[in-house]
Each structure stands twice: as structure tokens, then as C-alpha cells.
Amino acid sequence: MGRKKIQISRILDQRNRQVTFTKRKFGLMKKAYELSVLCDCEIALIIFNSANRLFQYASTDMDRVLLKYTEYSEPHESRTNTDILETLKRRGIGLDGPELEPDEGPEEPGEKFRRLAGEGGDPALPRPRLYPAAPAMPSPDVVYGALPPPGCDPSGLGEALPAQSRPSPFRPAAPKAGPPGLVHPLFSPSHLTSKTPPPLYLPTEGRRSDLPGGLAGPRGGLNTSRSLYSGLQNPCSTATPGPPLGSFPFLPGGPPVGAEAWARRVPQPAAPPRRPPQSASSLSASLRPPGAPATFLRPSPIPCSSPGPWQSLCGLGPPCAGCPWPTAGPGRRSPGGTSPERSPGTARARGDPTSLQASSEKTQQ
């Protein structure tokens, strides 16, 4: 909060005047003490209040300071209340304004040189000057720019190109002129363009150990750049698995690289078991019921390989290609579903093993 500012004029109230005198007298002596210690000087204060009471303060010995004062005959600085009022008016500070130290207010050129000369300093020497801080550098997001990811492109290697190979749309502007004390800028414009964006993550080494020696370097760089920048270029590229490594045309001749490992990882479907070929006699024997004579043969209920609209079972229609069963014209079934009369020749032709084998060989030829 600080001390309340009061008007610098005579205090009419006796009690308030006494309290103010006690406080400010102690403050004056405290300031004299600080000045004597900091600046190594001798100070003597002689105060008479309104009741003609004497109050004195001496940094060392009052008699010695007074003796030195009476014997001093050279020109010296001497001020009164009138001089203090004129100094405050020149600085634009009223009597009721804030209390400032002499070095805190504005100074005239003459007073500045006199003060420097009194302190032993050389006015001709340059004084250090303070400049404002340099403007902050732009953030990496503004320098490199955050581009929105394009649409999904599952076509292949379109997203494998790194972002550094494309020309950057950002061009750093020329730096503004700094304060007059700085001749060169703190950072050169080339420093902004030479920086590369930090990697998103470090890829695992040794994944492609089965690559040839000639393709390990560029192929590894291609995979690294794809893993680093695939999230920025194409967010949907990771959802579609790529083809195996051996299917690329730029690999050397011979067995494709990684084909054996790919075949070991992917299980092959088992082939169905094949049945041994059977002859016509064994087929007819397997279809003959037990206890039936060799001349008896039941029509096969197995559908024909290429049935027509008028037949449903082998032996009941015209012979088809590859069918081992002989049929006779008079014994086939009519389209209407009625069974015609069978002649003895039809039963004999169907039941004769010799004719059955001959027709089977003829069909196979």
C-alpha cells in the first residue's frame, strides 16, 4: 500500500504535527545513516523543532564535523527550501507528488554532466545501452506448415514419396530490421529452410534382413520414408495389405525373394483324394445285387453327366458321351412317363456281358 501522500504544508493540529515530526525525523536520520555507510562520508544533522528543542545526528563525532565545517573556505554546494522547490518545478513534480530519488526523475544535460564529473566518471565515455529483446522465432508448425491429408489412395506406392522431395510452399519472409545497436540479425533466413521436420518415430531396424545387398539401402530408405510419412500423406494406406515382396518386377531373376517364407506362412489347401479307375465289368459287378444272375442288370440310378430334357437316368434315354451303359431303342422310356413293352432282345442286350464290354470299349475309344 505504501505511505499516504499528504499535502506539503504546515500542519495545524498540534498532535498530528508531533507525530509527523517524530516519524519523519527518524526517517531522515535513517537516510543519513545509509548515505554515510554506502558513500563513505561524514554527516551531521542539527534540528530544532517548533518548541526550540535540539535534535542532532552525527555519523562520527559532531564536534569534529563542526570543526571541519568552520575551517572549510572553498566554494561548495548550499541549498535551501527555495532551491528544492525550484528543482521540483523544473522536473514537473509538485509538492504533493510522489517522492522520487534525484536519479529517478528527468535530468537536464548540465546536471547530468555535473553529476558524472562529481562521481569521478568521464562524460566522454560511451554508456551501455539496453535494447528490447529480439522478436520470437516462428514455431516449427508455422515454418513447415501442417498440410491436410489427401483422400485414400490404395493404389500402391503413391504415398511412399517423402515430404522433403516436394517443394515447400512456405518461404520465410525477410527478417525485420532490429534495434539500431544490432548490425546483423540473430538468425539467418537460411537457418529456417535448412531444418528438417523431426521424425514421428524411429523405425525398427533389421526387419528386411532377407533383401539382397544391392537393394537393402534404397529399399530400406523407401520403407523408412513410407513408415514416417504415410500417416501424413494417406491415412487409409495402412488398411490395405500390399503384395508379397517377390511379386515386384525390379527384383533379380530366379526364385522370387521371400517366396519360400511366404509359402511356409500361408497354408496350402489339401487336394481331395482320387479314386482309382474302375472297369466296366467291376462297375457292373458292384452294382449287381447279391444272389442275382450275371445276366440281370438293374438300371443305374446315377444321373447322367449331361442329361437331356427327355431322360433322367442312364439306360432310359439315348446314350451320352462317356456313358458306359448301352441302351436299346425299343426299351427306352417315352417322354410321357409310360414304360414301353420290353422285347427279349432288349433284356438280352442289357444282360449280355460280352455286348456290355464291347460297348464300353467302343465308348472309351
From Swiss-Prot:
Task: Extract the Pfam families matched here.
Answer: SRF-TF (PF00319)
**InterPro entries, sorted:** MEF2-like_N, TF_MADSbox, TF_MADSbox_sf
Q: Where is the composition biased (Acidic residues)?
A: 98-108
Provide the free-text tissue specificity comment from this protein's UniProt record.
Expressed in skeletal and cardiac muscle and brain.
Q: Which GO terms describe its biological process?
A: cell differentiation; heart development; muscle organ development; positive regulation of transcription by RNA polymerase II
Question: Superkingdom of this entry's organism?
Answer: Eukaryota
Protein function: Transcriptional activator which binds specifically to the MEF2 element, 5'-YTA[AT](4)TAR-3', found in numerous muscle-specific genes. Activates transcription via this element. May be involved in muscle-specific and/or growth factor-related transcription.
Q: Please give the Gene3D superfamilies that the UniProt record associates with this protein.
A: Transcription factor, MADS-box (3.40.1810.10)
Family annotation (PROSITE patterns): MADS_BOX_1, MADS_BOX_2
Annotated DNA-binding ranges come to 58-86
Instruction: Spell out the Polar residues composition-biased ranges.
Output: 223-240, 354-365
Q: Where is the MADS-box domain?
A: 3-57
- Which keywords label this protein? Activator, DNA-binding, Nucleus, Transcription, Transcription regulation
Q: How is this protein named in the record? A: Myocyte-specific enhancer factor 2B
Q: Give the record's GO CC terms.
A: cell junction; chromatin; cytosol; nucleoplasm; nucleus; transcription regulator complex
According to its UniProt record, which protein family does this protein belong to?
Belongs to the MEF2 family.
Subunit description: Interacts with HDAC7. Heterodimer. Interacts with HDAC9.
Primary location? nucleus
Q: Which GO terms describe its molecular function?
A: DNA-binding transcription activator activity, RNA polymerase II-specific; DNA-binding transcription factor activity; DNA-binding transcription factor activity, RNA polymerase II-specific; histone deacetylase binding; protein dimerization activity; RNA polymerase II cis-regulatory region sequence-specific DNA binding; sequence-specific double-stranded DNA binding
Q: Where is this region: Disordered?
A: 94-124, 142-309, 321-365
> Where, subcellularly, is it found?
Nucleus
Q: From start to end residue, where is composition biased (Low complexity)?
A: 277-289, 326-346
